[in-house]
Amino acid sequence: MKLSKKLFDEIIYTVKISPYESGGFVGGVTDTVTNVVYDSKNSYFASYIPDNDLLNDSIRTWAKNSIEFLGMFHTHYPNCASMSLGDEKFISELMKNICDENDILYFPIVIARKEISVYAAKLINSKCEIKKDELILLG
């Protein structure tokens, strides 16, 4: 996944003032994030639950400007860079419900409000495969 240094810094700054397990949505073109929407409605101690209305509104608004929905991000506590079983289950269900075969969505995890670890999910033969992805900072 590609992300400008400016957006990287914006995400890190914004989540510093948000509770852990908060998140948002990323949009852009192919594998390059150009837009971020922060979701502050549903933050809980141990999990991030996206605001479906905000997500759907974001997707509709982006579509009018040829911006694709690329995925969701959320924050984790320090020393927790990997996906939880809950994360994997949520992503698998999401992929099966909204994606076509071979679609890829990205699920960045912001760790300790200072770094970003990216995972890519792909639907192959109706099964969701989640793999660590490289974060490429642009500019």
Task: Write out the residue ranges for each language-model feature.
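Conserved beta-strand-loop surface patch within small alpha/beta domains used
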Residues: 1-69, 78-139
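Histidine-centered divalent metal-coordination motifs
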Residues: 74-76
